[in-house]
Curated annotation (Swiss-Prot):
Function: Polymerizes chitin, a structural polymer of the cell wall and septum, by transferring the sugar moiety of UDP-GlcNAc to the non-reducing end of the growing chitin polymer. CHS4 synthesizes a large amount of chitin and appears to play a role in the process of cell separation. CHS4 is particularly well suited for functioning at the higher temperatures associated with its poorly characterized saprophic environment and with human infection.
pH dependence: Optimum pH is 7.5.
Protein name: Chitin synthase 4
E.C. numbers: 2.4.1.16
Keyword flag Signal: no
Gene, per the UniProt record: CHS4
Pfam families (alphabetical): Chitin_synth_2, CHS4
Cellular component GO terms held in the UniProt record: cell septum; plasma membrane
Recorded superkingdom: Eukaryota
Glycosylation sites: N50, N180, N365, N404, N426, N617, N903, N1030, N1190
Catalytic activity: [(1->4)-N-acetyl-beta-D-glucosaminyl](n) + UDP-N-acetyl-alpha-D-glucosamine = [(1->4)-N-acetyl-beta-D-glucosaminyl](n+1) + UDP + H(+)
Compositional bias segments (type: Polar residues): 71-80, 133-142, 553-562, 1189-1198
InterPro entries tied to this protein: Chitin_synth, CHS4-like_dom, Nucleotide-diphossugar_trans
């Protein structure tokens, strides 16, 4: 089940004693639909004793003596949490490491929630008396290198209570060889040590590269085994790409030639020239023929030209009649006939032996020159000579020719029969069946196909007979292969057009109708969309250009709740002088969105209830001494319970002046939960900025833009993670020094800040890293571009990865990559949410964030990720949070990234339209289905956790153990993993979210805009796109295997991903085919119309999209520049990227002082010593720190809980490195 979030309101003693350990909802015992978690059937914990801490009432229980101010007027029934009727049975799934909820289930199995056997709510079991407050052992029951696959429901024995005041030894991670392995662990280790057979992929790569042995590769600069393996995998991938390109080329150009070979010569009726003579529907070239001497024909005469009667172009079928075949028995000898016969009754001829015109205009001529049977060629020699002639081609009729009313034509089995030739029968010579005359005189069969009319045995004989005696040609037909090729062509055409059209129209529908649902009702910017779009375009002309000032007073956030009144509501007054200005509009039938703040709406502010009275100094917005001590005594957030402090019992005996209990005097006060300046409940956001080698101007631009967003400072905090002690190329100071120079009002002086250890995302000895945590407030600087009236107080925390003492003298100490910077926050959020053991660094992050915000870190629901060279539009954060709050199914989103240095060079110019089309076409289309495959790391937002079902139930999203575990993968040993994790970590995070939560949404919010500078040198662009293209290919390979995405078969996101993958792989071949098609269309005939039309549509639809969605006509010019640069986009960049599949460096994209580009992921980094990293729960750290600060003996108290309000997740003692 999703992790419960249950506050502990005050209850009566009677209630405490009589409360049942089970809840009311019969569906809570069912596993959560999203995670499929099934609680253990046998409770692993001992039963609760009488007199211990009572169970809290369910948030939706009628016995709960509190009611949230913003509670849903139509609350969701608890049965909604249960699994709905479905054909899907999660319990039948195979739960292995490939399962999207594998790690979540392992964590959830250890939650303090006992399963219900009566169908009531799950029970939060407080095992206070069973926990060990201190431990004398420095060793844990696990190893950093151990793979844990055991039963997640295995019960954990409670520890023994230690004597009061016994000093607690630090808990540390230890190596595997420092403890004894259990039998189960030995078995697993033995399985891991087994040599596994090579995979099919490795075998294929070895076969493809058999011609390059290792010794040869070593001579070409590949001494490391990992390098050679990456090179072989690269060649394997390139071979597959070439095969796919060859297949596409075959379908485009070779398939028709293969299945529809060029037919023989076919001559259209009435177009057979004088060099041919027609016999039985075939044209014979008699241009060079010589006839033997015969009566009326000289020796070696050519019958086409040398005789008085010119036979060229005529039909001579009557001169070589097919007699006594199918017509035997139908056409018989007439009484008194002169036609010769033999003993079998075979006739010598049926018609007069003469020729007739091919157009059927010849009159019937029954006379014979010289003698009866002249020119009938009845001798064997004549017949054999005729049969030896080679037919030049077939004479064909079109259906228009057949339906010509001037002729009496019909079709039988593909042969064209001239029924008027039946008039040439001589009654005195032969007799024929009456059916012949009926067919000839029946006007309804003229121009028709008689194949299905003549179906009886007799009728079929009549049809075959007519074919033998009256055939004049064949119907114009195509072979099966030609028909198949046309079917493939038109199906492909329709298919591609359907995809292009659907993508275009759905993207347009998203821009016009769907996108507006995400936007906030009111912001600090103008409410006119056209005016705002123009301001954004002007703003993006220069990276340093400030945002426009507020020009529309009606849209300001001051005093606005984001709602518009209806005309009908003005008839009667809806408010009075006693109505709170922050009152929630309960007239709406839709339930209000759920946030952490709205769920804590029964909380009140510090004594006095008003942030500007009693506890606060109204002039300087600072806490007075009494308020600061009150906050320090509670160690909770500024939102305190209206009836009791959440965990005041934990801190009752602590000195409020201790180092942990201090909250900064400049902390931004929290407004009431009912305050909705933008029309939706506010949610707390962490703005994560990852910095590497950026300069002062770039970082200042980014932090200024975040600090001056119109989103309230009480609900946002800036977190900057500096990836090592790095000095950018051409910079006078290191990046950490630059960032620290932008902070003020430090909680701890920078020179007094210590470095703390944590487990980094790396390999070998680099897994141990150290970092410093600086907490304070953002300082705009003395020469700030920001107007002093706009400078606001924004809490800020900086994490500087400084490295271990061993790497202090090395290059780039502390540098572990951007993914490690993100994991620092993600892992921290996971451990806060699950109350797991955390490192010292994470404990300091907890304290630092709480001291400068007054909020517990678990109150933060979203993370805005911004690169340190990006500038955010003032209302972008407001729109992004609006989308998240309005739709809890959205787990990730991104805004539009615009280019600030458009005219820096031709390299930057060709990127303008590419950025535009990637957002407004690709991402808009994917947003319709909630499946944006790539959320750019420079400007995106992820949901930390999402409300689920009833009140106070939350599901971890970004903080989900499966996300954190997979994203923090440190065993990167294959080409696929290296491209995913070393080059495209931002895109891989989006892929990982979709794989883990395929039913949730990732969308594009066009109202959120940022600007950035793009590469203006071609070598930098080449390096950047190499990383992006290779990352795209490998992420699409991962995503195409996810079967649970929206839709089915061809109408699914999975199929769209497959098409994108194939399209990306064949880009170089496709552009080559395009140019070939254009060239052959110019130089050869006939012109291939269909491919050209398809090409025009594909290239022309974006122009229509510009007209309908863009706000400047200049984008037409940018599109023209983009089309001219298509060879670069579709050939040069992809081909270079494919050839560099085994290059995992960032190349020219981010250069530091004195850095030399090298291939990443191939160096040996030593051995990881886990004993240097201490991990404890927050309560243990807190107790130890306060005990040391007070200098007194710590009296054992019930286990400390973090100020999140969540119970400790018992069962996470050891740190596991999966």
């Amino acid at each position: 089940m999703a992790e419960p979030r249950m506050p502990r309101p005050a209850t009566s003693p009677t209630r405490d004693k009589s409360h049942s350990p089970y809840r009311e909802s019969p569906s809570r015992r069912l596993r959560d639909v999203e995670t499929g978690y099934n609680p253990p059937q046998n409770p692993p914990y001992p039963p609760q004793r009488n007199g211990t801490e009572p169970y809290p009432p369910s948030p939706s229980s009628r016995t709960a003596d509190w009611e949230p101010i913003m509670s849903n007027p139509n609350p969701m029934s608890q049965s909604d949490l249960g699994r709905k009727k479905s054909l899907i049975r999660p319990e039948r799934n195979r739960i292995d490491r490939d399962h999207p909820n594998y790690y979540y289930r392992k964590h959830a199995a250890n939650m303090e929630v006992l399963p219900s056997t009566t169908g009531n709510d799950p029970v939060v079991e407080d095992l206070a008396e069973h926990r060990t407050v201190s431990s004398g052992s420095t060793q844990q029951d696990t190893s950093i290198e151990e793979e844990v696959v055991g039963n997640p429901q295995k019960s954990r024995m409670p520890g023994k209570l230690e004597p009061v005041g016994k000093k607690k030894a630090p808990r540390k991670l230890v190596r595997k060889d420092t403890r004894n392995l259990t039998e189960e662990e030995k078995r697993r280790q033995k399985e891991l040590d087994k040599i596994k057979p090579p995979s099919i992929w490795n075998i294929y790569c070895a076969v493809v590269t058999f011609w390059a042995p290792d010794c040869l590769l070593q001579c070409f600069g590949m001494p490391a085994r990992a390098q050679r393996r990456a090179w072989r995998e690269k060649v394997g991938l390139i071979s597959i790409i070439l095969l796919i390109a060859a297949f596409v080329g075959f379908l485009t150009f070779g398939f028709t030639q293969a299945v529809c070979a060029a037919p023989g010569l076919r001559l259209k009726i009435n177009h057979v020239d004088r060099g041919y003579m027609i016999f039985h529907g075939g044209a014979y070239n008699l241009d060079g023929s010589m006839h033997p001497a015969a009566r009326g024909i000289p020796l070696d005469a050519n019958v086409l030209y040398d005789l008085p009667h010119k036979y060229g172009g005529q039909d001579g079928s009557f001169m070589f009649q097919k007699v006594n075949g199918a017509c035997k028995g139908l056409i018989t000898l007439a009484e008194g006939s002169d036609v010769p016969t033999n003993s079998d009754g075979d006739l010598a001829w049926y018609f007069p032996c003469t020729a007739f015109n091919q157009d059927g205009s010849s009159e019937v001529n029954l006379t014979s020159p010289y003698y009866l049977g002249y020119a009938c060629h009845t001798t064997a020699k004549a017949r054999n000579t005729f049969y030896s002639l080679k037919k030049a081609g077939d004479v064909y009729f079109t259906w228009d020719d057949i339906k010509n009313k001037s002729r009496n034509l019909a079709v039988y089995s593909g042969s064209v029969v001239d029924l008027d030739l039946l008039k040439w029968f001589n009654k005195s010579q032969v007799a024929w069946p009456q059916q012949f005359d009926d067919l000839r005189e029946n006007g309804r069969v003229r121009g028709m196909d008689l194949t299905h009319v003549l179906q009886s045995a007799t009728d079929k004989q009549v049809g075959r007979c007519l074919t033998q005696i009256a055939k004049v040609g064949s119907i114009d037909t195509e072979s099966v292969g030609c028909i198949a090729s046309k079917v493939v062509l038109y199906v492909s055409l329709v298919f591609i057009l359907a995809i292009v059209a659907a993508k275009f129209f759905l993207a347009l529908a998203f821009q016009w109708f769907l996108a507006r649902r995400f936007a906030a009702a009111k912001t600090s910017q103008t409410s006119d969309p056209k005016k705002r779009a123009k301001q954004i375009e002007d703003w993006t002309d220069d990276i340093y250009k400030p945002a426009p000032k507020i020009t529309d007073p009606a849209s300001t956030v001051t005093g606005s709740d984001g709602r518009t009144s209806k005309r009908g509501s003005m008839f009667l007054p809806q408010t009075s002088r006693f109505t709170s200005p922050y009152a929630v509009d309960r007239r709406s039938s839709r339930p209000p969105p759920t946030t952490m703040t709205s769920q804590s709406s029964n909380a009140k502010l510090l004594p006095g209830g008003n942030p500007y009275k009693s506890g606060f100094n109204s002039s300087q917005n600072t806490l007075d001494l009494h308020s600061r001590m009150s906050v320090g005594a509670s160690r909770s957030s500024l939102l305190l319970s209206g009836q009791e402090t959440r965990y005041s019992a934990v801190m009752d005996n602590l000195d409020p002046n201790g180092p942990v209990g201090f909250i900064h005097e400049n902390v931004v006060p929290q407004p009431p939960p009912e305050w909705q300046p933008f029309g939706y409940p506010l949610a707390h956001v962490i703005c994560l900025v990852t910095a590497y080698s950026e300069g002062e101007d770039g970082i200042r631009t980014t932090l200024d833009s975040i600090a001056t967003t119109d989103y309230p400072n009480s609900h946002k905090a800036i977190l900057v993670v500096c990836d090592g002690m790095i000095k950018g190329k051409g910079e006078a100071q290191s990046t950490p020094d630059i960032v620290l120079g932008m902070m003020g009002d430090f909680v701890i002086a920078p020179e007094d800040v210590q470095a703390f250890s944590y487990v980094a995302v790396s390999s070998g000895a680099k897994r141990h890293n150290m970092a410093k945590v600086y907490a304070g407030f953002y300082d705009y600087g003395p020469k700030s571009r920001i107007d002093p009236t706009k400078q606001q107080r924004v809490p800020m925390m900086v994490v500087v990865k400084c490295g271990t003492p061993d790497e202090a003298t090395k290059s780039k100490p502390g540098n572990r990559g951007k993914r490690d910077s993100q994991i620092i926050l993600m892992s921290f959020l996971q451990k806060v949410m699950f109350d797991e053991r955390m490192t010292e660094l994470e404990y300091e992050m907890f304290n630092g964030l709480w001291k400068v915000t007054g909020m517990s870190p678990d109150f933060y629901e979203m993370v805005l990720m911004v690169d340190a060279d990006t500038k955010v539009f003032p209302d972008s954060l407001t729109h992004m949070v609006s989308a998240m709050v309005k739709d809890p199914e959205i787990m990730g989103l991104c805004g539009e990234t615009k280019i600030a240095n458009k005219n820096a060079s031709w390299v930057s110019r060709i990127q303008v339209f590419e950025y535009f089309i990637s957002h407004h076409l690709s991402k808009s289309f994917e947003s319709v289905f909630g499946g944006v495959t790539c959320l750019p790391g420079c400007f995106c937002m992820y949901r930390i956790k999402s409300p689920k079902g009833g009140q106070n139930y939350w599901v971890p999203i970004l903080a989900n153990p499966d996300i954190v575990e997979h994203y923090s993968e440190n065993v990167v040993d294959t080409l696929h993993k290296k491209n995913l994790l070393l080059l495209g970590e931002d895109r891989y995070l989006s892929t990982l979210m979709l794989k883990t939560f395929p039913k949730r949404k990732q969308v594009f919010v066009p109202q959120a805009v940022c600007k950035t500078t793009v590469p203006d040198e071609f070598k930098v662009l080449l390096s950047q796109r190499r990383r992006w293209i290779n990352s795209t290919v490998h992420n699409l390979m991962e995503l195409v295997l996810v079967r649970d995405l929206c839709g089915t078969f061809c109408f699914s996101m999975q199929f769209v991903v497959f098409i994108e993958l194939i399209g990306t792989l064949v880009l170089p071949a496709a552009i080559s085919f395009t140019f070939y098609l254009i060239i052959i269309s110019i130089v050869k005939k006939p012109v291939p119309v269909i491919p050209l039309v398809l090409l025009a549509l594909i290239l022309g639809l974006p122009a229509i999209l510009i007209v309908l969605t863009a706000h400047r006509w200049s984008y037409i010019l940018w599109m023209g520049i983009y089309l001219l640069s298509l060879p670069i986009w579709n050939f040069v960049l992809p081909a270079y990227a494919f050839w560099k599949f085994d290059d995992f460096s960032w190349g020219e994209t981010r250069k530091t002082a004195g850095e030399k580009t090298k291939k990443a992921g191939l160096e040996y980094e030593g051995e990881f010593d886990s004993s240097k990293i201490t991990m404890k729960r927050w309560g243990d750290f807190e107790r130890e720190r306060r005990a040391q600060a007070n200098g007194s003996v710590w009296n054992q108290q019930p286990p400390t809980r973090p100020p999140s309000g969540y119970g400790s997740m018992h069962g996470f003692e050891p740190y596991r490195d999966y």
